Amino acid sequence: HLDLLFGRYTAACTWLERLTGVSSVGLSYRPEGIDSLTALTCQMAAHRACATPFHVADMSDVGFPPVNVIEPGLIKFNFGNEPCGMNDWNDIATHRRTYTWITDEHQHPTGITLTATHPMSGANQLGATYTLTRMLMPACVSMSALWGYSQGKFGAAQARPMAEFVLGHLNPRLKYDFTIYASRGGGAYSRQTTFVVQGEESEAESLQATDNDHDVVRFRDVCPTADGRILLQVMPGPHNNSHHHFYYLNAMVIRAH
């Protein structure tokens, strides 16, 4: 209940029902940073706690089933703090650690979650605005990025040797193809960024983010772990010679098959 987002929202929903008798279930209001699925879970938790205050509330019927059986369309991620506002792209920012409402290109729920277990240091809009990749990114996607750095001190941002994201609740019967893009305009030095994808096996690829408008890294036929998880790690590449060893993540497209 001390969590600044869903914890406080759950507490507020509980007080609403206890003080007024009005259940919060179904209310459209949700604080910034809380998606619709998380909001419903908070509302249901508060309502059931009020209904049976001396018992642990059973929440097993709320949300998606334990094992994901959904076969989604293309899943697109836009990384950065400026929302793109396009329904077929999932905006992933620094102010939220876990996203539980991930949709595919048709706006259908996928049941997949994305959690920044080791978050990036910050965000910018300094990527390429015109790109030549098979990802077909609009400018609002290709130019926005999350960034990190691993050496020295850069402003108030914390140095992190790597960032890590966990894709959870994947359909364990499917394989996944990843296409990942990183870009940062300007500068004569290398901002090479390495990406590691780890499911049942681990693979690594690198690209040059400096002034990149065409290169992507691809991982094919990635099998999730038995519990439906794939890890994505982002870090400076071996040829990165930027002063603080900056690394970037702008966009990602996942195809399930």
Predicted regions mapped to residue ranges:
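Extracellular carbohydrate recognition and processing domains
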Residues: 202-223
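Surface-exposed molecular-recognition determinants
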Residues: 145, 160, 164-166
